[in-house]
Amino acid sequence: MNLSLNKLIGQRPDIQYGKTERHTPDWLFILWMGGTALLSYSLVYALRKPFTAAEFEGLTVAGMDYKIVVSIIQLIGYVCAKLFGIKYISELQPQNRLKFIIGSAALSEASLLAFGLLPLPYNIVALFFNGLSLGCMWGVIFSFLEGRRTTDILASIMGVSMALSSGVAKSLGLYALNQLHVSEFWMPALVGGLAFPLLCFMGWMMTKFPRPTAADIAARSVRVTLNGQQRWALFKQYMPLLLLLFVANLLLTVQRDIKEDFIVCIIDVDTISSWLFAQLDTIATLVLLSTFAVLAFSGNHLKVLYTLLGLSTASMGVLALLGSGEVQLSTTLWLFLQTLCIDIAYLSFQTIFFERFMLVSK
């Protein structure tokens, strides 16, 4: 029997279904919520990715390059958190979101301090907990935005923070290394220490977002927590598609992490400005935001899904061409295309794809 998501979830007597109306103009509402979410996840990146600016040249662990080891360790922690999040995020009550954000950010910064304090090679374990503590943050922040008529554009604004903040985190890390002469092991803690209090403040700001209105719920359906039985019923109904999407998303996550972690080793960073990563990622961010904004205004949910899949497939084709070595490009253009193509595919899944998927199955 083909059950809709609403039937699987049902109405919850303990949830207020849009009893208040929002009087804030839509454009101001989008700027407020989208901007806060964008800054929040940018700060998450500052806690997770500044170490990618370091090369750790000449260091090894058990015969393997040190940076490869720490990147793998952090990625394992991050993926483990994603798997735990399937259960945890779906059951997280709204009143506990801020506690989760503060606790996760605190554990992340503590792990970065441990990375600087502990001797080699034992400090690599600290980055496992760094990845573990931050792997669910996307889902928690996104839960403040979902279930609204403006969710597509809000999610797009939040999503492009990944493209923007990645370059900014690297540029901050390179600035700390090259201009402030901070060691490669303490640089992540310095950048993370600046981000931690700001992320806590942004988390508090998100608790002030208004609830979805009656019009939001009528257009997008109410979002409530799911217990184990409801999750299993939903998974069984869409199992083949969800498994394919899960594998694709996992591979994109790994591919993006490899690119983010080792790009400073692939190119000669001594020949470029420390802020080139931030500049290129800002341009890519504007392209992505424009693309997702156009799709956000489409009411044909199935057409949007097909468009996102088409864009993702095309971007992977361009990446394959770049990786083949058949095309000779300047460093700047190569970096830009790498960022744009990976983020088109990755952010499609992270932002509006699953929101529209839920609406198609409504």
Per-region residue spans from a language model:
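Transmembrane alpha-helices of Major Facilitator/SLC transporters
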Residues: 273-300, 315
